[in-house]
């Protein structure tokens, strides 16, 4: 009977890739062959450290021993709600990531206090930066900062970053390579701030505005004014009306449009009105409707029949985050 030890290296590597980092390191002690496999560069391209309370000393060890030039994407957590004595992410650690991991392209930070970590310390190779439930300082993203910071940044996700406000949003305009912006629960951003910032971010190709205090109509108006080259839009339907849909009509290169519930707006456009507006968008190929209770209903049939050239997706809202800090 074949055992785990009889499997070829490629199969074992695939199995090991699903293991948490801690277990990966533990199995390296089983035998010399497994130790060699755990050291394989392929296994350390994408690392998720959010499952653990990762002390800085351990993080430094992982950085020196396993990750280094192999690392392509890193997901890690901080200690934002662990008390003032808890260790925090440091500028030195961020700079070391940049120096020792020249291939790092994606960094996702969760529940981290970045108020003492200047943005200038982040790795300059980043193309994607995600902040989830993080704390930032007032000057973290402001426009007056060094314009050469993160020259390759193409995508930034700001999810439940309570300090993020209009001034930070306007500071994003210095990232000339930026093409994708996701705002989730950034309740301090105003309609005026969004409009002013999008005017200078006219090169964006993807915009998501989810769970903010902005009305969908005002967001669509700002998009129609300034983002004529946008290819993907996703937004919550709060404050969406038929008039708001009119703002999107004729968008020349829009390929994907998503409306996300829950349905709390009294003036929500009918499926027929949505079809009518979508037919004016020559490049539209995907329409997605989430959390409006339309799945399996007449509304879904109207959308599918009215937009035969599109992939129409009608489904329930994605599950709420199960992160303990929420």
UniProtKB/Swiss-Prot annotation:
PROSITE patterns: FBOX (PS50181). LRR repeats lie at residues 51-78, 86-111, 113-133, 161-185, 186-211, 212-236, 237-261, 266-291. InterPro entries: F-box-like_dom_sf, F-box_dom, LRR_dom_sf. Keywords: Leucine-rich repeat, Repeat, Ubl conjugation pathway. The keyword Cytoplasm does not apply. Pfam families: F-box-like. Pathway: Protein modification; protein ubiquitination. Residues 1-47 form the F-box domain. One of its GO terms (biological process) is ubiquitin-dependent protein catabolic process. One of its GO terms (cellular component) is ubiquitin ligase complex. Substrate-recognition component of the SCF (SKP1-CUL1-F-box protein)-type E3 ubiquitin ligase complex. Mediates the polyubiquitination and proteasomal degradation of CAMK1 leading to disruption of cyclin D1/CDK4 complex assembly which results in G1 cell cycle arrest in lung epithelia. Interacts with SKP1 and CUL1. This is F-box/LRR-repeat protein 12.
